[in-house]
Amino acid sequence: MQWETVIGLEIHAQLSTRSKIFSGASVAYGAEPNSQACAVDIALPGVLPVLNRQAIEYAIRFGLAIDATINSPSVFARKNYFYPDLPKGYQISQLEHPIVEGGHVAIQTGDQEKTIRLTRAHLEEDAGKSTHEEFHGMTGIDLNRAGTGLLEIVSEPDMRSSAEAVAYAKVLHSLVRWIGICDGNMQEGSFRCDANVSVRPAGSEALGTRCEIKNLNSFRFLERAIDYEVARQIDILESGGSITQETRLYDADRDETRTMRSKEDAHDYRYFPDPDLLPVIIPQEWIDQIREKLPELPKDKRNRYIQDFGLQTYDANILTAARELADYFEQMVSVLPGQSKLCANWIMGEVSARLNKEGLEIARSPISPEQLAGLLLRITDGTISGKIAKDVFDSMWQSNGDSADTIIDAKNLRQISDDSEIEKWVDDVLAANPQQVADYRAGKEKAFNSLVGQVMKTSKGKANPAQVNSVLKKRLTE
């Protein structure tokens, strides 16, 4: 039997506010346990939550970026369950009136583009953290994270493979960073994925029994967990068994999912409106003000790069994967108008390779976009060849801000375009390689490339390649 995979994702994006969503406590990462939990966070009697206005604005910003509806009024509800790191015995979340409803994003897998619908995005507070490593036979509770503002982004079950799920998660990861509402640091838990996975016979419209895989904090783990879970469910069904609706966790060391607890539905949490928080009324004027402040979004910038700069879709997708990368590219193009493809090639090639090797973000590149544009200018005006430019790039990376011109002059790397000197090198190479000359004249084109290489070697890479080609062809046809 052929099976179809059905996947929906719930993504928790930690909002980049300076304080928590219902208290004034700091959200700085890495503080001593329980040093950033105030009376509201630890649920002392008599305290009341006060909603963080910035969290509301961030949620609206996200909703506008995905073409969603902003609900007004928006209502907070209590999600009731008992857990050691949840001091109140309930979590403040949203159920019936989320702040963001609907919306969509486009993903790319291979050559295929697909639209993924979003169900909703709602605000909620994070729980604390249970730790086990330092307490033999006991559990430690750290409430620093309790009350931290989250935007939970829920998709429709529109994904049909782990590749699509990863592509969707990457699009959202890029978007929340792009619009400045989340730092996206997956190692610190700022961006976490829960995957709802089921399978059904190919062609069926009915949804299968789903299992939820919790707290996947890397794209690689997301892909591997989904692949394992799909194979597990198919194996059970083909053996005559049935799938139990449950929550599972992914064990990266064993590369498997394991049962965590039975899966709860909304009624199990006994949601009801929080009596301590009034419904949030969002004026249209405020929404319009936030819309005006939105940066150019990735999809719009991508289309502009294709139309205005003539870039291929693949190149435009890469350059708009992060706002800092797009800014770097645009600053280069402003210095080198008409050379957008050359700028894109160097960013995606030499710059990205070096950044990946050293584990750096583009914002920490030791070569500024203006400096790199200065290097490429020396290629376009014939001062140096592309090969020499790569050597200059390496020197610029390792220097303390030296410009391309400084390094070119210090190392005497300027390209030689003097006809008489190039003719001398060509004549010397032809005299030393009579067999290759004969091969070329006999129709073997590869011999020509070999001769070009030897001329460039003789000139120590300084000869103008275009002139070498021209002089060499002239000599070989004489």
UniProtKB/Swiss-Prot annotation:
Domain of life, per lineage: Bacteria
Enzyme Commission designation: 6.3.5.-
Record-level GO BP terms: glutaminyl-tRNAGln biosynthesis via transamidation; translation
Family annotation (Pfam families): GatB_N (PF02934), GatB_Yqey (PF02637)
Keyword Cytoplasm: no
Gene3D superfamilies, alphabetized: 1.10.10.410, GatB domain, N-terminal subdomain (1.10.150.380)
GO molecular function: asparaginyl-tRNA synthase (glutamine-hydrolyzing) activity; ATP binding; glutaminyl-tRNA synthase (glutamine-hydrolyzing) activity
Catalytic activity, as annotated: L-glutamyl-tRNA(Gln) + L-glutamine + ATP + H2O = L-glutaminyl-tRNA(Gln) + L-glutamate + ADP + phosphate + H(+); L-aspartyl-tRNA(Asn) + L-glutamine + ATP + H2O = L-asparaginyl-tRNA(Asn) + L-glutamate + ADP + phosphate + 2 H(+)
Alphabetized UniProt keyword annotations: ATP-binding, Ligase, Nucleotide-binding, Protein biosynthesis
Quaternary structure and interacting proteins, as annotated: Heterotrimer of A, B and C subunits.
Family listed: Belongs to the GatB/GatE family. GatB subfamily.
Purpose of the protein: Allows the formation of correctly charged Asn-tRNA(Asn) or Gln-tRNA(Gln) through the transamidation of misacylated Asp-tRNA(Asn) or Glu-tRNA(Gln) in organisms which lack either or both of asparaginyl-tRNA or glutaminyl-tRNA synthetases. The reaction takes place in the presence of glutamine and ATP through an activated phospho-Asp-tRNA(Asn) or phospho-Glu-tRNA(Gln).
Protein's name according to its UniProt entry: Aspartyl/glutamyl-tRNA(Asn/Gln) amidotransferase subunit B
Gene that produces this protein: gatB
